[in-house]
Amino acid sequence: MKFFALFIYRPVATILLSVAITLCGILGFRMLPVAPLPQVDFPVIMVSASLPGASPETMASSVATPLERSLGRIVGVSEMTSSSSLGSTRIILQFDFDRDINGAARDVQAAINAAQSLLPSGMPSRPTYRKANPSDAPIMILTLTSDTYSQGELYDFASTQLAPTISQIDGVGDVDVGGSSLPAVRVGLNPQALFNQGVSLDDVRTAISNANVRKPQGALEDGTHRWQIQTNDELKTAAEYQPLIIHYNNGGAVRLGDVATVTDSVQDVRNAGMTNAKPAILLMIRKLPEANIIQTVDSIRAKLPELQETIPAAIDLQIAQDRSPTIRASLEEVEQTLIISVALVILVVFLFLRSGRATIIPAVAVPVSLIGTFAAMYLCGFSLNNLSLMALTIATGFVVDDAIVVLENIARHLEAGMKPLQAALQGTREVGFTVLSMSLSLVAVFLPLLLMGGLPGRLLREFAVTLSVAIGISLLVSLTLTPMMCGWMLKASKPREQKRLRGFGRMLVALQQGYGKSLKWVLNHTRLVGVVLLGTIALNIWLYISIPKTFFPEQDTGVLMGGIQADQSISFQAMRGKLQDFMKIIRDDPAVDNVTGFTGGSRVNSGMMFITLKPRDERSETAQQIIDRLRAKLAKEPGANLFLMAVQDIRVGGRQSNASYQYTLLSDDLAALREWEPKIRKKLATLPELADVNSDQQDNGAEMNLVYDRDTMARLGIDVQAANSLLNNAFGQRQISTIYQPMNQYKVVMEVDPRYTQDISALEKMFVINNEGKAIPLSYFAKWQPANAPLSVNHQGLSAASTISFNLPTGKSLSDASAAIDRAMTQLGVPSTVRGSFAGTAQVFQETMNSQVILIIAAIATVYIVLGILYESYVHPLTILSTLPSAGVGALLALELFNAPFSLIALIGIMLLIGIVKKNAIMMVDFALEAQRHGNLTPQEAIFQACLLRFRPIMMTTLAALFDALPLVLSGGDGSELRQPLGITIVGGLVMSQLLTLYTTPVVYLFFDRLRLRFSRKPKQTVTE
């Protein structure tokens, strides 16, 4: 009593306290960062190594394996995967959530250093690492195009000037430059001309290497001067290499131009990038795992004018893709939803109280509680994101509930003629414990979420803490500011209501009277209600088992990502044509705004595409509907597939795949894996629950297998080293010399001119100069035949691995797909030597599925413990918790009705319902106990009176919560796919709960009261608590 009086009778202090809370909240709001979701990125580091010309199997055994053994010993590595292809190896390390990325980077560097002595000596550079996840979609893509500069020159500008500058911006983890390669002098040799002149490829390589040398020459001094010595020992351009003498034949000089075509070109001609059908260089920017995407994008945009000034005017630098506009639009939609929810909740209060003066009180209490929460969010290091803003939206209903309970009870005393200050004090005292019970039990619901580990726990923590803080501040405001305002603002008389609202008042009275009559009937037929209650419990179990489930709602971020997978024997020229064909199909779609893509590099038969869709208000279809429409058109392209998926804000794992979900096959027997992977993939491709099934196992690439006759080689005076060097010189785009420039270093690349390697007969033109100086054709000591060979070799840990990726067809859920895959693996009878497991997001879904029921039970148990402590009773908490089954049925039925799978967002809705619907029972039980203690009423009379007296606040709080969640259901625009499952769950649960709990709660109350009397040692005492 004294606590409440302290604030009621000191209005200035109470107002200033509320002002202080509001000001702190405003300050916190201004400093809060903006993000799509809470920070849930796993720390990921990518290690890259190269050995030009080495086969995938060689890269896997000689480069990947030594690095994996060293890297696998790092503390905190949760997953290690690698992929080795022609000349390159990439190892992805995913660390535990609590692992500091910078500390992990230091350990990675130490592990690379430890493995260095085990790596091949011919590697052009040491392995490097990047603190970025290559499977993440870029947060921004910049393109460089020009009508005057070559692709190599554009790539040089991008990699030398732009990428290093962008990499230094806070939050940027990696800038990947694609679409071409650095400028280079390319030497295309003519095998026949070399044979005619008696010049070997090694002779050419040695001559070029010796002619382009950068060595110190020293200085010359006399008594008074000093001169640095400088020579023309370097060759910079193709024109300077052309006249280089490489050999003498019969006294005549053989120049490089006589036996080769020398051009200013690029290091790797098997690269291509495009934007909207125009050749382009792409800068794909990814953020650090812990970085804020909006802040990083804003920093890049602020730097762009400065970057524009560093490149020539003839080069066009454009933003081809930017993830931030849809994120900002989504957050704006949530903010609008929050404002609408507050307005609707205040409207509900006004309709029930029918007093503008009374309505002002919750209209002040709600903003103070919500704004004050921003200060706590800032102190906790949170951000303004979809989940935290949704928490505030839902908190509006909880916040106003506390104010309603206090306000309605004070208003009831005022209508009975009590003086305002006395009514404020008396009314607050009566419901103070009720408000405390509702708030503490509601916060208790989220305690298991705070203790939940892994990605789901990290994702839900901000939601739970934000909501809990809002409830805590609301509790303080409701017991201080609200009663003070009631005492000083309201009058001791019935409020004057407007004529147009009298009808609503009469309707409410009629509804209350009708409820009283029906309640009397129910209390005389309690067995029927008991059957209904048991039925809802059983229905909950059945609905939960049968409802489709997924991890997170499929988002429409306005960005699509596509992976191209072509025939494994396709040439680069044909692959570039496929890229152009696919880009044209997509660019012609009316919902597409921009298309960029690239192909080439170490994997000639693959490519990537990034598609920006038009804003949501300019298209009628969702991203998934657009994908479904494009899938049919793309399927008509022969010899290649383009797998599209909508970019999501949450992507787990470091695997680069062509679809959203992954299923990984592991085996210590590579032959068994290669035998069973095609069988499993083909089986999964027939399942209706899966779409776009594809695999990263590519072991059917075309290979030309050369077999040396070692005896013949020995007789001819040729060793294997010379023969291998011949092949590398001819076909390996061998980098044989370095050109040093002030801003960068460039290579001299030697190979047989592509004009002479159009078919297999090119091998017949190759020859080696033996130790006697004779030209020996390759065909004299080697035979060759076509064969199959892997284009890539993949590992997970130290086991051979193959990852099957898949998307979900429209109308299918991840639980449907998971169950179908498990059935297929059982039907196939896959041996124990091949192990299958879900990976990435699908793996997290499996883990979440296993913990969902435990989490709900833990929340209910926590609420029971808190209520039991508050009521000093084992029984009354059960009465209060009896409201939950009906809410669960309503929520699950609503999800089924709206065709929405049960996701992590729906789980939040269920947890919220545990907190919301028990409020009705708390208000009934509190007043019933009070009536039994002080009114000398029987349990049936007490609960009946409590139900009627609390009917108005119960209706008010329920409708406030209902109207609070309704904008989430009805919201459209960006991010609505995240908000709708939460709103659907809450609205469905509230509607069903309100219909049933007004009757089941009094029945359960009486049931437990009779049960207690039956087993009580003091049968005359009806209420002991």
UniProtKB/Swiss-Prot annotation:
InterPro entries: AcrB_DN_DC_subdom, Acrflvin-R, Multidrug-R_MdtC. One of its GO terms (molecular function) is xenobiotic transmembrane transporter activity. It is a multi-pass membrane protein. Keywords: Cell inner membrane, Cell membrane, Membrane, Transmembrane, Transmembrane helix, Transport. SUPFAM superfamilies: Multidrug efflux transporter AcrB pore domain, PN1, PN2, PC1 and PC2 subdomains, Multidrug efflux transporter AcrB TolC docking domain, DN and DC subdomains, Multidrug efflux transporter AcrB transmembrane domain. The chain crosses the membrane at residues 3-23, 333-353, 360-380, 387-407, 431-451, 463-483, 528-548, 853-873, 875-895, 897-917, 953-973, 984-1004. PANTHER family: MULTIDRUG RESISTANCE PROTEIN MDTC, PTHR32063. HAMAP family: MdtC. Belongs to the resistance-nodulation-cell division (RND) (TC 2.A.6) family. MdtC subfamily. This is Multidrug resistance protein MdtC.
